[in-house]
Amino acid sequence: MSLEPGQLDEGAGPAVTPGAPARWEHVTRGSERWVRGRGRSLEAAFEQAAMALCALVEDPSAVAVREEVELECASPEPDRLLADWLRAVVHAMASRHLVFRCFAVRRDGTRLFGHAFGEPLDRERHPFARDVRGVSLVDTHVWRGADGLWTAECEVEL
């Protein structure tokens, strides 16, 4: 899928070029809102997709690392694995009232093991953070491009 000019939201991570670090971004297509992560590995793309999702709630740079949460999911299909991973992130945010700054992901076959790093939601420190009770993951896509970079994207409705 290619982007048309003006479709990237401001606040996206740094640009990705071969050899460059991973990035995340928000993409709009009409009324649809997508989160997208890119990286040199599938794991890096999943980390960045989770960053994009969390950035819809609070600016990750405003979040301190005070807690670590372990997350795990499994699926033989990368698209389904992405959806399950993002659901696990949202569940941790909603059930524990946390906001996250960063993620570390490791994959072993069909299983994904992740660590989310962040802090409890504090209205004084995070006055503009959105409350997350759930998310609808409408469509997910995972692929490796001709440039060798992995992309993981998902349409979201908070």
Q: What positions do the PLM features span?
A:
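N-terminal intrinsically disordered, cationic/polar leader segments
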Residues: 2-158
